[in-house]
Amino acid sequence: MKKLYTFLAMAMLTMMTFTSCDVDYEDRMEARTLEGTWTGYIDNYYYDRWGLSGSSYRTAFYFERENPYGGWGYEVDYDARRPSDYWYCEFKWEVAHGNIRIQYYDRDYTDVVIYDYMLDEYHFSGNMDDGYCDTRTHFSLDYDKAFNWGYWTRGATTRGASDEYHATSTGCFAKE
């Protein structure tokens, strides 16, 4: 009987060495799925002295992979009723440990982490946090092969053009 228990223990230990959670593999697959253009809505919610307040805008993200875990891209947030009111910025991104980190090239904007997200070939939704504000940002996007970036990117500088890159914003998105 003792030999049977020893054999079972050795078999279980052997099986455990062959099973593992490959976080790197999952991150690579998420980065591969993320590549392309995603369009939808971004919602910001916060509490002010009158209660819950917020705003909702159309948004589009473009993700280009440079390595297995990340790359570069750009984002535009705009008012669907007035597309000339928009915010456009380029960024670097990386998938690490199940989160997506976005670092905006414009240093006036803080980096964000996308967490608690759901991503498949057709839909991408989740939450963003910059670590500073009490604002809750939720987004819901669909994969979009036909989005026309021309309106927003024609006046944009190329990524890495200078250390003084600034986002482009007009109308209600312009900083005062």
Model features per residue range: what roles?
Residues 9, 36, 40, 71-73, ...:
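Small side chains
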